[in-house]
């Protein structure tokens, strides 16, 4: 059996990962029910990250 991964929009908000790049991306925040900017470190993290606010909202805001 494959482990079940949470849907992208239910994954942790703003997971920047262990690296030290400075990349502005957007992540869906379940607490505020909004897509918000965060800084991504460039590696690992999770799938709750989008290049644009519009892309995040299209995927996560119903």
UniProtKB/Swiss-Prot annotation:
- Keyword field contains Disulfide bond: yes
Gene Ontology MF terms in the entry: serine-type endopeptidase inhibitor activity
Q: Where is this site: Reactive bond?
A: 20-21
Disulfide bond sites = 9-60, 19-43, 35-56
BPTI/Kunitz inhibitor domain: from which residue to which, for each copy?
Answer: 9-60
Q: Which Pfam families would you find in this protein's record?
A: Kunitz_BPTI
Any single Gene Ontology cellular-component annotation: extracellular space
Give the record's keywords alphabetically: Disulfide bond, Protease inhibitor, Serine protease inhibitor
Q: Where is this site: Pseudo reactive bond for trypsin?
A: 44-45
Say which domain of life the source belongs to: Eukaryota
Disulfide bond is among the record's keywords: yes
Q: Which PANTHER family match?
A: BPTI_KUNITZ INHIBITOR DOMAIN-CONTAINING PROTEIN, KUNITZ-TYPE PROTEASE INHIBITOR-RELATED
> What functional role does this protein have?
Inhibits chymotrypsin and thus avoids the accidental chymotrypsin-mediated activation of prophenoloxidase. This enzyme is required by the insect immune system to produce melanin which is used to engulf foreign objects.
What protein does this entry describe?
Chymotrypsin inhibitor SCI-II
Lineage, top ranks:
Eukaryota, Metazoa, Ecdysozoa, Arthropoda, Hexapoda
